[in-house]
Amino acid sequence: MNKNSWILYIGILVFGLVAPFIFPAFKVQLSILCVLIVLATTWNIQGGEMGYNTFGNILFYGLGMYLCASVQVGMFFPLAEWTESGGEKTFVHTPSQFFQGMAAGLVVAAVVPTIVAGLIGYAILGLRGHYFAICTLGLGVAAGEISGGIEIIGAGQGFTTPPFPNIGGLEAVSYTHLRAHET
């Protein structure tokens, strides 16, 4: 890697760190942009570098989001009551509960989709061409249909994630809505 590449990468990193302060009205859009960059990178690795036309990446992304949110809530509150309450009950995480739950959820969200990807990959990586593409597309569609029927994670309504706690009287902007789909 030459000197100009390093300067470019450092410039992008610095811009990414200061952009929320320079453009405060666009914090959510910038965070969504970062998520989409990660998804595009997974597509590039599989579709470009490896030569596989895969459409199932979103399965692992969604599985990780739902697992992280479910573990974060389920550690301290009954998950079924959280998703069924529809705003009737109020559940409030303390800051320590919020961050402990998020840490545990992130670990589970990293490990379980990795194992699932390994098992699914072992089963379907022998397919080639159109067969592989159709199989991975079917996996994504099937996962959406299955998750739409599981009531404990909100089924068709989605999963409301815990709000970011107020710490020291300061209210932080919450990006937890990016972790689980809400409709």
Predicted segments, located by residue:
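Transmembrane alpha-helices and adjacent helix-loop boundaries
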Residues: M1-R179
